[in-house]
């Protein structure tokens, strides 16, 4: 089996996913184009070598629909010969796109592939693509359907994480993100988004709130109380997990991931393809895995999939230097830390989605790039990237510097 190497990665800054966000006037297609074009230009890439473009997108409808990967490859001038495919595994779509691209190379069927993701949440709203799970009783009842926020609160209740625990984690995410930006740790990977006149619309993540503290978070009301109690989802949670007497609602806008716009792209290929292109590999894909998990708890997939991917790679937890666990909700990361008895010094060291935002289909590709940069900066060797996923799933990838 061939090895799949990571040659480079880029991302856009993350804009607030609201009408007043700096990227609201930029379509998902344009965001994807920015990332793909930057990847091509900074590597002087002969796109005749690119066999496919794989992009994750969680709500691929309207202007973000119709196989946005193919459209993005065309507008980014990759050439008529470069195909594209859009994939969707909810919040892990960007990481799964990279895994999909890596698998093509490892199977010997492709020489060079781009993986990544895009989401314009300010223009195509969360949940715009619909689906059977929340509306069809045939699946909703059987799988204990409840909104993700209620599931996050169920995790916090079941595993003993208080409102203060979740808020303290959020404060740390803000501090780490702000410091990483202040120290210039993202400058080599983030490409600004400009308008048609070349004027910069956004060059840094704009969702961050560096002044966040426990006092300011304490003033926010829990977001999912009414949904859980009036909507009946608390009762569903207790039915699914009878060891929980009642759901304690601890999550709110300040300790949950931010709604943002953004895109990312990662260049992968075989050793031979890299040599032909004159590129130096930065890392290799060691292993990747996917699992299904309890759909009621929904967001605990990173724990189980981490065990699976480590076993697949023949590694122990101690073999991993850094972990990126998507900060969908504070309790997701707290449960991961608890399950593996991990120190915070190895997890999300540059901050995460609570501070910088979670552009759904792009996030997996973004955080893989972030941790690769950190491995290089600190001289460390291996990292594990994982995301929780709606409907109860998990995806994980292990990368290793070369």
Where are these regions (language model features)?
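N-terminal extracellular/periplasmic Venus flytrap/periplasmic-binding protein-like
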Residues: 10-13, 24-34, 42-44, 168-271, ...
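Glycine-rich loop/linker segments at domain edges
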Residues: 12, 16-19, 102-159, 226-229, ...
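Active-site pocket-shaping loop/turn-to-helix segments
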Residues: 14-37, 41, 59-62, 85-99, ...
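Conserved beta-ketoacyl condensing-enzyme motif
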Residues: 22-113, 118-134, 190-203, 296, ...
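Conserved catalytic cysteine-centered active-site region
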Residues: 27, 57-110, 131, 143-150, ...
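Active-site pocket-lining segment
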Residues: 153, 189, 196, 286-355
